[in-house]
Swiss-Prot record:
Its EC number is 2.7.11.-, 2.7.4.-. It comes from the Bacteria. It comes from Paracidovorax citrulli (strain AAC00-1) (Acidovorax citrulli). The keyword Transmembrane helix does not apply. SUPFAM superfamilies: HprK N-terminal domain-like, PEP carboxykinase-like. Residues 273-278 are annotated as: Important for the catalytic mechanism of dephosphorylation. Both phosphorylation and phosphorolysis are carried out by the same active site and suggest a common mechanism for both reactions. GO terms for molecular function: ATP binding; magnesium ion binding; phosphorelay sensor kinase activity; protein serine/threonine kinase activity; protein serine/threonine/tyrosine kinase activity. This is HPr kinase/phosphorylase. The active site is at H146, K167, D185, R252. Its cofactor is Mg(2+). The Walker A ATP-binding motif also binds Pi and PPi.
Length: 318
């Protein structure tokens, strides 16, 4: 699900201090919003903000030094036409950057069309970077998943599995081994660009871990600030299963790495069988270390296949 609402006044207040901007025109349009169709079709926040461009409607139009020069350095008729064309773009907001002064005709147009216009001394490139990052997160596709999300050896790992397999207890043991908790039970994931999924904890569950028989534990209070994380990029899913499930649904040694689709992004996945006596925490850390090697281009399975092929060739040649 992708949220599709952010109004001009919300955007203004969010960056009143960072961008030190002023609301110079269109004060009566505080509820003006992004076009919902444009938001749904946008691949990321980068599609929703940019320099003044007449072929990209429905986005925040940034007016820097060059854009203002283009609007005013022409005959009076051309200036009027160029400024009037901005209305057809239906921008949610106009932003004057680079300490530029708005031409009177532009101010009048914003008042007539009720288009909010903000002005800042910051550079246009900086404004675009800041707004793109904000809009990418605000309008990101999102989903809530059940599991324990952790920082294990610097990698964002989601532990999933059937109920009663001890996911939270496993999380507690991993925390005691120096890893960090992001979220327990419910994890909010956001696709912030085409290949990146970021996860964080809902505010209501911040720092909390539920362990059966003990109850709710405040991990930050018990283990300290370094035992919790605000957010992490999802890089691996560890799925816990019972023996019969593993034998029925999964190969013992899969030829291709397993993946799971999360918001349209394939995420690496490993399956670990839960049996009495197994040290699951050690197995999870081993899976994470192996994933780190894979991300660096080191594939142990493919190296084994190549080693086996060479051995077969040597045997056939002898």
């Amino acid at each position: 699900m992708k949220p599709n609402v952010v109004s001009a006044d919300v955007l203004f207040e969010a960056f009143r201090s960072p961008l030190k901007w002023e609301w110079v025109a269109g004060l009566g349009a505080s509820e003006r919003r992004f076009d919902e169709v444009a938001v749904r079709s946008a691949r990321s926040g980068a599609d929703l903000v940019g320099y003044l461009n007449y072929i990209h409607p429905y986005r925040v139009q940034i007016l820097g030094e060059r854009e203002i020069a283009y609007l005013v350095n022409a005959t009076p008729e051309d200036c009027k036409r160029r400024i009037a064309r901005i209305v057809t773009l239906e921008p949610p907001v106009l932003v004057l950057a680079d300490s530029q002064m708005a031409p009177d005709a532009l101010l009048s147009m914003c008042e007539r069309a009720q288009i909010p216009m903000f002005a800042t001394h910051e550079s246009s490139a900086f404004v675009i970077d800041v707004l793109r990052a904000y809009l990418s997160k605000h309008f990101a596709d999102r989903i809530t998943m059940h599991g324990v999300f952790m920082d294990i050896l610097g990698l964002g790992v989601l532990i999933t599995g059937e109920s009663g397999l001890g996911k939270s207890e496993l999380g507690l043991e991993l925390i005691s081994r120096g890893n960090g908790l992001v979220a327990d039970d419910a994890v909010d994931f956001f696709r912030i660009n085409q290949t990146t999924i970021e996860g964080k904890c809902p505010d209501l569950l911040q720092n909390l871990l539920e362990v059966r028989g003990i109850g709710l534990l405040d991990i930050r209070a018990i283990f300290g600030e370094t035992a919790v994380r605000r957010k992490m990029r999802l890089r691996l899913i560890v799925h816990l299963v019972r023996k019969e499930t593993l034998e029925r649904e999964y190969e013992r040694l899969p030829y291709e790495p397993l993946t799971q689709d999360v918001l349209g992004v394939p995420v690496l996945k490993v399956v670990i069988q839960v049996v009495a006596g197994r040290n699951i925490a050690v197995l999870v850390e081993a899976a994470v270390r192996n994933t780190i090697l894979n991300l660096r281009g080191i594939d142990t399975y493919q190296e084994f296949v190549e080693r086996h092929r060479r051995a077969m060739e040597q045997r056939d040649g002898s």
